[in-house]
Amino acid sequence: MDGIRPGQMKLGKPEGEDCKSLRALWEEVFYGDSRKFTDYYFKEKAALNRGYVLRDGEMPVSMLYLSPYPVMLRSGDTFACRELNYIVGVATKEPYRHRGCMDRLLKEALRDMYGKAQPFTFLMPADCAIYRPYQFTYIYRRAEYTLGNGPVTGRGKTCTMGGMKKMGKEDLPFLAEFAQAYMERHYDVFIRRDIPYFTRMEKELQAQEGGIFLAGEKDGIKGYLLYAEEEQGEIQEAVWEGEYGAWGLPAHPTGQKTPVIMARTVDAKAMLSLLRAKSGSITLRICVSDPVLHGNNGIWNCVFTEDGAEVYKDSAGTKAAKNYREREKKNAPVLMAASAERAYDLELSIPALTSWVFGCGQEEQCACPVDGADLDMGEKVRRKLCGIRRLEHVFLNEIV
């Protein structure tokens, strides 16, 4: 193993059933997962993934999965569904760590997703410091709950939690209809809630000695809990209609939220195309800098309306993006307005672009004039940014 570099190892991209061949490496690295959960994952989900693996000879030493999810994205007053990738199972054998294995796999996966014009990808990091150098940034904070008086009692269909009953197969279409409608009313970005989604989720929670519990039944469903019993018991998700407490939910919100999901812009054009104007038409010229996916670099001409977005690259923008990357290296601000002399309105690093699209960056920060920029120009850009409808309400609560 000594002296072997990632570039000398064989890169493989298993798909379908071949992804299951990486189970031994998964178990070696994620040894804290229960056998029951691992069995579930490799029976129900692994074959749906696309794998990336480095082998030393025939031995897998580093891996990751791209797990496809149907993501609902608000587009004006409607939604579009895109298959996007959740990066999971990032694992390297201990003797091969800190040698660039993950770097090679992650960059290869990003390039493949870029080739498919995917707007973004997301993951749940074990350590956010690992992914920040690859321009990932947090976009979703998960609400925390405590369990009140109402432990899980009974078994099978008679299992209850407080005043809630465990979901049965007959409840699936009603739960899917309720959840999808709820998400569309409250969020701009979420995983599609349908019968296959809740069927898989029930199996996943059962693998963690938990389940799905309902407030109400059939077409009268008013809320649900996703509960996992492993360790101390955990409410993974709590959704209800109306005032909290009206349905006897045994989960109490603490008011705290924990950052759990990071995302990265993959294709800048596709990402910017998700935005809409709140009214009328708004034109912006945005300089983007990406140290990994160089096709994103340059000046993007954007015309946002209430119904769509036209985004195309200015071929003269490459030099501007290069100059911006040099300022980034000197710890200059990563999100700023351009001066009146520049050929663009706004400069965005990849983390700044991602944060801004998902409502994590304020318009005032975006339009902060620097380097002698005209104050009126900064205010003009700020007004434009305030007129753009971003995807501010994110609910990416899938935990792997």
Regions found by a protein language model. Give the residues of each.
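C-terminal functional modules
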Residues: T258-V400
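Conserved active-site alpha-helix within GNAT-family acetyltransferase domains
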Residues: G115-P119, P125-E144, A270-M271
